[in-house]
């Protein structure tokens, strides 16, 4: 049965249904008037109708039953016609059907559809529908799976499965209500969640898999033929999951397309034309093929555009500052256009040679992805991105080869499915598509990266039980307030560089931010993948040293003892009249001066050593005291002089020994006085003066000699 006949039968069924309803209403009225006795008063005992009565041996209730049976028959006829329209047991020609959610397959008839699809973009399928049900429940359809099937003579040509992203109820006519449905792939769900998060030491396949699993998208295939190394630090920043994946795949030269089977849409990620399989074979048949049963290409054009001919990318990495980090790539078709059209970009978004070379090649292939393209049209629903089509029967033999479909747009019309469309013609299908060489590596165009709008606040983090956590470059790990996945530990971020007031080759200033400190983070080029700590701040939990505002005149450099309560400090007090420089060492203090050191104190100088002091002077020491000097030694005092020792006193010198004094001279002891030398011990006195007179006084004199005793003098007087 033809589609037009199906529709005619459907409309007849609706008419019969309406008449059945009217008859049923009349029968009910008659039954009520007769008080439920039927037509007994209008019949004779033989059961024949009296003159002027209803024909037939039925009472009022019987008539109602017949009307109800007519209503049921009309409904069944309508359902049968709908089933035939949806592709019944004997379909013929081109047909479109749709199933959605758990609804019965005959719920909808397709009036028209438009399908747009392309490399690295979620397909969009808009379907016009009609249904005998005027009140389809939206929750039964929205966010549920739906499948559009295109059949030719009852054989499936292609089916497209996705999720219902939009559902709209339209006008209700005599027998039908119109609906509009938009179907998107499961991947489209990623457009609905915006996020900010950090991925560390992961390659792009791992990142993509993680995000898609969070959306319960598991029909994923990776067909990657080129290396895609791990990324040390990769940030999704205030962008949807979809925008993040689009950006990353574009950077890595990865494109994707969809495959449909068993009521599923599988997203395939690829990076080489070799991952695109062969598809349909299409003959070239010029003219209008929208209603022809055999798929064919009716129109075909080709075009070339001037595009950048070479790409140069440059970047920088602090781990190898001498590395030029510069890569170039040129197009191969040097006769097609001028070669000096160059695309130069900095930063190139790479930090190693593997990424640098690949990104440069990917960028050139992306910028030239439409330099040479073909455009075609026909009625082939099987033409789709991710499948090659092979052209045949073209008068140019070189065109009869496989081609790679980049994008396609299909539109189908089934006007006879509408209750008002019986005179609008039969089912039609039209396809427009673009294509490139089958061995060309198509790449998605580069996308802008999110830009961080100014500095941010973050907290220094590390492993439990540690206070300082850094690497050989003095980098630290941070917990950003927007990172919901970080656990404020040593895995919360990658190693992040810290600016210092002074930095050189083995010299400069170094202050490592400690765990728990709040820091100010900026981003190189506004790139969320390149954070750098530029400052530190106090807050309510980390208060400044001293007691503000009372100590507002002080400037302090105070550290904190690692896993302790002490500190080292250099303090400047700038209060007028109380200016002071204070140095506090929690334990040891070492000072090393390679040449001279001068210290000048204009008032008093006091030094206190609680324990011992050692002073070692390898050369000479000179000490000058303009007034008095007092040395007090609590216990012993020892002075050792390696050679000569001279003491010069301008006026007087006195020495007092409480108990004993011993003087030992190895050879000669010489004492010279200008006037008098006097030795006293109790009642004994020895006095020598400059005139040569020697006086010895004592109570008793005792001379003992082991040898001779000689006394020589001018006069010797012995009393």
Task: Tell what function each PLM region has.
Residues 14-197, 251, 371:
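Assembly/oligomerization scaffold segments
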Residues 126-136, 368-379, 502-508:
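Short alpha-helix capping/helix-loop boundary micro-motifs
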Residues 140-141, 383, 399, 513:
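Short, well-ordered loop/turn sites that connect or cap secondary structure elements
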Residues 148-149, 391-392, 518-521:
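A generic structural signal for residues embedded in beta-strands
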Residues 154-163, 397-406, 415, 526-536:
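Short, Lys/Arg- and Gly-enriched loop/turn segments at beta-strand edges
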Residues 168-183, 267, 411-429, 468-473, ...:
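Short, solvent-exposed secondary-structure boundary/capping segments
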Residues 172-173, 202-221, 226, 234-438:
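Extended, domain-scale alpha-helical bundle/helix-rich regions
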Residues 251, 258, 269, 452-697, ...:
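Structural signature for extended repeat/solenoid scaffolds and their inter-repeat hinge/linker regions
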């Amino acid at each position: 049965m033809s589609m037009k006949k199906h529709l005619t039968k459907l409309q007849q069924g609706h008419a019969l249904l309406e008449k059945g309803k009217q008859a049923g209403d009349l029968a009910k009225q008659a039954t009520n008037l007769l008080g439920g006795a039927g037509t007994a008063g209008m019949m004779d005992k033989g059961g024949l109708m009296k003159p002027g009565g209803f024909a037939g041996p039925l009472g009022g209730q019987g008539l109602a039953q017949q009307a109800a049976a007519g209503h049921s028959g009309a409904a069944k006829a309508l359902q049968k016609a709908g089933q035939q329209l949806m592709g019944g047991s004997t379909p013929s020609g081109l047909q479109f059907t749709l199933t959605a959610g758990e609804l019965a397959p005959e719920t909808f008839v397709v009036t028209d559809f438009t399908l747009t699809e392309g490399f690295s973009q979620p397909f969009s399928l808009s379907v016009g529908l009609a249904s005998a049900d005027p009140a389809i429940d939206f929750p039964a359809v929205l966010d549920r799976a739906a499948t559009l099937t295109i059949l030719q003579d009852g054989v499936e040509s292609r089916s497209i499965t996705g999720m219902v992203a939009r559902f709209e109820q339209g006008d209700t006519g005599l027998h039908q209500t119109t609906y509009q449905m938009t179907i998107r792939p499961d991947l489209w769900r990623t457009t609905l969640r915006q996020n900010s998060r950090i991925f560390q030491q992961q390659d792009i396949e791992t990142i993509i898999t993680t995000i898609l699993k969070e959306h319960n998208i598991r029909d994923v295939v990776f067909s990657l033929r080129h290396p895609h190394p791990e990324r040390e630090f990769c940030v999704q920043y205030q962008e949807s999951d979809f925008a993040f994946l689009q950006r990353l795949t574009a950077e890595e030269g990865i494109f994707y397309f969809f495959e449909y089977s068993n009521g599923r849409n599988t997203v395939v990620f690829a990076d080489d034309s070799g991952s695109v399989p062969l598809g349909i074979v299409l003959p070239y048949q010029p003219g209008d093929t929208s209603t022809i049963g055999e798929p064919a290409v009716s129109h075909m054009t080709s075009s070339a555009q001037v595009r950048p001919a070479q790409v140069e990318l440059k970047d920088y990495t602090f781990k190898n500052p001498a590395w030029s980090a510069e890569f170039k790539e040129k197009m191969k078709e040097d006769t097609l256009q001028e070669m000096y059209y160059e695309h130069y970009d900095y930063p190139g978004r790479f930090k190693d040679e593997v990424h640098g070379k690949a990104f440069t090649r990917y960028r050139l292939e992306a910028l030239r992805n439409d330099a040479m393209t073909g455009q075609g049209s026909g009625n082939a629903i099987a033409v789709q991105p991710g499948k090659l089509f092979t052209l045949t029967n073209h008068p140019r033999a070189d065109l009869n080869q496989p081609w790679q479909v980049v994008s396609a747009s299909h539109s189908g019309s089934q006007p006879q499915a509408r209750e008002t469309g019986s005179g609008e013609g039969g089912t039609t299908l039209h396809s427009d598509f673009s294509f490139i060489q089958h061995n060309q590596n198509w790449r998605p165009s580069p996308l802008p990266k999110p830009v961080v709008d100014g500095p941010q606040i973050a907290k220094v983090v590390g492993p439990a039980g540690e206070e300082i956590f850094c690497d050989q470059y003095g980098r630290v790990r941070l917990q950003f307030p927007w990172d919901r996945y970080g656990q404020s530990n040593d895995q919360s971020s990658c190693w992040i560089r810290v600016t210092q007031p002074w930095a050189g080759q083995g010299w400069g200033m170094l202050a490592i931010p400690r765990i728990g400190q709040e820091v100010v983070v900026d981003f190189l080029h506004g790139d969320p993948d390149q954070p750098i700590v530029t400052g530190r701040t106090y807050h309510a939990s980390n208060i400044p040293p001293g007691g503000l505002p009372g100590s507002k005149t002080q400037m302090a450099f105070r550290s904190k003892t690692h896993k302790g309560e002490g500190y080292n400090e250099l303090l400047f007090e700038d209060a007028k009249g109380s200016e002071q420089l204070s140095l506090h060492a929690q334990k040891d203090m070492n000072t090393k001066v390679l040449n001279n050191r001068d210290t000048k104190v204009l008032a008093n100088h006091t030094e206190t050593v609680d324990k011992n002091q050692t002073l070692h002077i390898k050369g000479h020491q000179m000490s000058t005291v303009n007034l008095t000097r007092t040395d007090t030694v609590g216990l012993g005092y020892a002075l050792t002089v390696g050679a000569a020792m001279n003491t010069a006193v301008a006026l007087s010198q006195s020495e007092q020994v409480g108990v004993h004094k011993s003087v030992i001279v190895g050879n000669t002891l010489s004492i010279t006085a200008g006037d008098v030398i006097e030795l006293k011990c109790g009642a004994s006195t020895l006095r020598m003066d400059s005139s040569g007179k020697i006086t010895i006084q004592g109570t008793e004199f005792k001379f003992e000699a082991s040898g001779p005793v000689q006394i020589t003098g001018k006069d010797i007087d012995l009393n």
